Amino acid sequence: MCAGLGGPSTDAAAVIVALAESWGIDRADSALDNIARGIGADVPFFLHASPAFYVGGGDVLATEYPALPATPVVLVKPREASVSTIEAYRRFDETPAPADKPGAIASALHSGDAEVAYALVHNNLGVISAQMEPRIQTVLDWLRSQNGTVAVNVCGSGACSFALCDSAATAVNLAAAAQQNGWWAYATELVSDTVRIEAPKK
Protein backbone atom coordinates (compact mmCIF):
# COMPACT_ATOMS: atom_id res chain seq x y z
CA MET A 1 0.00 0.00 0.00
CA CYS A 2 3.05 2.28 0.38
CA ALA A 3 1.31 4.09 3.22
CA GLY A 4 3.94 4.38 5.94
CA LEU A 5 1.86 2.26 8.31
CA GLY A 6 4.58 -0.31 8.97
CA GLY A 7 2.70 -3.23 7.42
CA PRO A 8 5.62 -5.63 6.82
CA SER A 9 7.22 -4.69 10.15
CA THR A 10 4.02 -5.28 12.11
CA ASP A 11 3.58 -8.62 10.35
CA ALA A 12 7.11 -9.62 11.37
CA ALA A 13 6.53 -8.49 14.96
CA ALA A 14 3.25 -10.43 15.08
CA VAL A 15 5.05 -13.62 14.04
CA ILE A 16 7.71 -13.10 16.74
CA VAL A 17 5.06 -12.48 19.41
CA ALA A 18 3.02 -15.50 18.33
CA LEU A 19 6.05 -17.81 18.33
CA ALA A 20 7.16 -16.51 21.72
CA GLU A 21 3.69 -17.22 23.09
CA SER A 22 3.63 -20.68 21.52
CA TRP A 23 7.08 -21.59 22.84
CA GLY A 24 6.56 -20.10 26.30
CA ILE A 25 9.15 -17.34 25.89
CA ASP A 26 8.70 -14.23 28.02
CA ARG A 27 7.91 -11.31 25.72
CA ALA A 28 10.16 -9.13 27.86
CA ASP A 29 13.15 -11.29 26.87
CA SER A 30 15.70 -9.02 25.18
CA ALA A 31 16.51 -11.81 22.73
CA LEU A 32 13.20 -11.07 20.99
CA ASP A 33 14.27 -7.46 20.42
CA ASN A 34 17.57 -8.69 19.00
CA ILE A 35 15.76 -11.01 16.60
CA ALA A 36 13.40 -8.21 15.58
CA ARG A 37 16.31 -5.82 15.04
CA GLY A 38 17.86 -8.32 12.64
CA ILE A 39 14.72 -8.24 10.51
CA GLY A 40 14.19 -4.48 10.30
CA ALA A 41 14.92 -1.29 12.20
CA ASP A 42 11.33 -0.61 13.23
CA VAL A 43 10.30 -4.19 14.02
CA PRO A 44 11.35 -3.95 17.72
CA PHE A 45 8.99 -0.99 18.15
CA PHE A 46 6.01 -3.14 17.23
CA LEU A 47 6.83 -5.76 19.85
CA HIS A 48 5.75 -3.35 22.57
CA ALA A 49 2.27 -1.98 23.20
CA SER A 50 3.04 1.31 24.92
CA PRO A 51 4.52 4.57 23.60
CA ALA A 52 8.31 4.37 23.60
CA PHE A 53 11.49 6.26 22.76
CA TYR A 54 14.05 4.47 20.61
CA VAL A 55 17.66 5.46 19.95
CA GLY A 56 20.44 4.31 17.64
CA GLY A 57 18.92 3.54 14.27
CA GLY A 58 15.50 3.73 15.89
CA ASP A 59 15.79 0.10 16.92
CA VAL A 60 17.11 0.30 20.50
CA LEU A 61 14.51 0.78 23.23
CA ALA A 62 15.52 3.57 25.62
CA THR A 63 12.30 4.41 27.48
CA GLU A 64 8.76 3.05 27.65
CA TYR A 65 5.90 5.31 28.74
CA PRO A 66 2.44 4.64 30.21
CA ALA A 67 -0.25 3.69 27.73
CA LEU A 68 -2.35 6.56 26.40
CA PRO A 69 -6.17 6.44 26.35
CA ALA A 70 -8.02 5.12 23.33
CA THR A 71 -8.12 7.98 20.84
CA PRO A 72 -10.20 8.26 17.64
CA VAL A 73 -8.11 8.65 14.50
CA VAL A 74 -8.76 8.86 10.77
CA LEU A 75 -6.28 7.64 8.16
CA VAL A 76 -6.34 9.29 4.73
CA LYS A 77 -4.30 8.47 1.63
CA PRO A 78 -4.54 9.63 -1.98
CA ARG A 79 -5.27 6.38 -3.82
CA GLU A 80 -2.42 6.52 -6.34
CA ALA A 81 0.13 8.25 -4.12
CA SER A 82 3.25 6.44 -2.95
CA VAL A 83 6.63 7.35 -1.49
CA SER A 84 9.80 5.29 -1.65
CA THR A 85 10.98 4.99 1.95
CA ILE A 86 14.59 4.53 0.81
CA GLU A 87 14.42 7.67 -1.33
CA ALA A 88 12.75 9.65 1.45
CA TYR A 89 15.56 8.77 3.86
CA ARG A 90 18.18 9.52 1.21
CA ARG A 91 16.75 13.00 0.69
CA PHE A 92 16.41 13.49 4.42
CA ASP A 93 20.09 12.66 4.89
CA GLU A 94 21.00 15.20 2.21
CA THR A 95 18.87 17.96 3.72
CA PRO A 96 17.65 17.04 7.21
CA ALA A 97 14.41 18.67 8.29
CA PRO A 98 14.77 20.13 11.81
CA ALA A 99 12.84 18.68 14.72
CA ASP A 100 12.29 19.78 18.29
CA LYS A 101 14.19 17.93 20.99
CA PRO A 102 12.01 15.17 22.46
CA GLY A 103 12.14 16.43 26.05
CA ALA A 104 8.73 18.11 26.06
CA ILE A 105 6.80 15.25 24.50
CA ALA A 106 8.72 12.74 26.64
CA SER A 107 7.66 14.63 29.75
CA ALA A 108 4.03 14.65 28.60
CA LEU A 109 4.12 10.92 27.86
CA HIS A 110 5.78 10.19 31.20
CA SER A 111 2.97 12.00 33.04
CA GLY A 112 0.27 10.48 30.83
CA ASP A 113 -0.83 13.89 29.51
CA ALA A 114 -2.26 12.84 26.16
CA GLU A 115 -3.51 16.33 25.27
CA VAL A 116 -0.05 17.87 25.52
CA ALA A 117 1.63 14.87 23.89
CA TYR A 118 -0.70 15.04 20.89
CA ALA A 119 -0.14 18.78 20.54
CA LEU A 120 3.59 18.10 20.24
CA VAL A 121 3.36 15.37 17.59
CA HIS A 122 5.85 16.00 14.79
CA ASN A 123 7.28 13.95 11.92
CA ASN A 124 10.27 15.59 10.27
CA LEU A 125 10.58 12.76 7.74
CA GLY A 126 7.01 13.54 6.72
CA VAL A 127 8.15 17.00 5.65
CA ILE A 128 10.39 15.37 3.04
CA SER A 129 7.67 12.95 1.95
CA ALA A 130 5.21 15.78 1.38
CA GLN A 131 7.79 17.51 -0.81
CA MET A 132 8.25 14.31 -2.83
CA GLU A 133 4.51 13.68 -3.21
CA PRO A 134 2.48 16.94 -3.28
CA ARG A 135 -0.81 15.07 -2.82
CA ILE A 136 0.30 14.31 0.74
CA GLN A 137 0.46 18.03 1.45
CA THR A 138 -3.00 18.46 -0.08
CA VAL A 139 -4.39 15.89 2.37
CA LEU A 140 -2.54 17.46 5.32
CA ASP A 141 -3.87 20.92 4.49
CA TRP A 142 -7.39 19.54 4.14
CA LEU A 143 -7.27 17.65 7.44
CA ARG A 144 -5.89 20.67 9.29
CA SER A 145 -8.76 22.78 7.99
CA GLN A 146 -11.40 20.44 9.43
CA ASN A 147 -13.14 20.91 12.76
CA GLY A 148 -12.40 18.41 15.51
CA THR A 149 -8.85 17.41 14.57
CA VAL A 150 -6.43 17.34 17.51
CA ALA A 151 -3.21 16.56 15.63
CA VAL A 152 -2.45 15.98 11.94
CA ASN A 153 0.68 14.54 10.36
CA VAL A 154 2.18 12.04 7.94
CA CYS A 155 2.34 8.35 8.87
CA GLY A 156 5.99 7.33 8.76
CA SER A 157 7.36 8.11 5.31
CA GLY A 158 3.85 8.36 3.79
CA ALA A 159 1.86 8.43 1.69
CA CYS A 160 -0.86 8.02 4.32
CA SER A 161 -1.66 10.83 6.75
CA PHE A 162 -3.53 10.74 10.05
CA ALA A 163 -5.66 13.03 12.15
CA LEU A 164 -6.25 12.41 15.83
CA CYS A 165 -9.85 13.44 16.48
CA ASP A 166 -11.89 14.78 19.38
CA SER A 167 -14.53 12.05 18.98
CA ALA A 168 -15.27 8.84 17.13
CA ALA A 169 -18.04 10.66 15.25
CA THR A 170 -15.55 13.23 13.98
CA ALA A 171 -13.26 10.47 12.71
CA VAL A 172 -16.13 8.70 10.94
CA ASN A 173 -17.39 11.93 9.36
CA LEU A 174 -13.90 12.90 8.20
CA ALA A 175 -13.37 9.47 6.66
CA ALA A 176 -16.64 9.82 4.74
CA ALA A 177 -15.73 13.32 3.56
CA ALA A 178 -12.25 12.20 2.51
CA GLN A 179 -13.74 9.36 0.49
CA GLN A 180 -15.98 11.91 -1.23
CA ASN A 181 -12.74 13.63 -2.26
CA GLY A 182 -11.66 10.40 -3.95
CA TRP A 183 -9.15 9.41 -1.27
CA TRP A 184 -8.84 6.14 0.61
CA ALA A 185 -9.84 6.76 4.22
CA TYR A 186 -10.55 4.74 7.34
CA ALA A 187 -11.78 5.72 10.80
CA THR A 188 -10.32 3.76 13.70
CA GLU A 189 -8.72 4.44 17.08
CA LEU A 190 -5.38 4.24 18.85
CA VAL A 191 -5.52 1.44 21.40
CA SER A 192 -3.27 0.49 24.29
CA ASP A 193 -3.47 -3.30 23.87
CA THR A 194 -1.93 -3.54 20.41
CA VAL A 195 0.23 -6.56 21.25
CA ARG A 196 -2.00 -9.50 22.12
CA ILE A 197 -2.70 -13.05 21.08
CA GLU A 198 -6.17 -13.99 19.90
CA ALA A 199 -6.26 -17.75 19.43
CA PRO A 200 -9.21 -19.17 17.49
CA LYS A 201 -11.76 -20.97 19.63
CA LYS A 202 -11.73 -24.74 19.31
Range-by-range predicted roles:
Residues 3-31, 45:
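DPxDG-like acidic metal-binding loop motif
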Residues 1-4, 149-152:
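Short pre-catalytic strand/loop immediately N-terminal to key active-site residues, enriched for Gly-Thr
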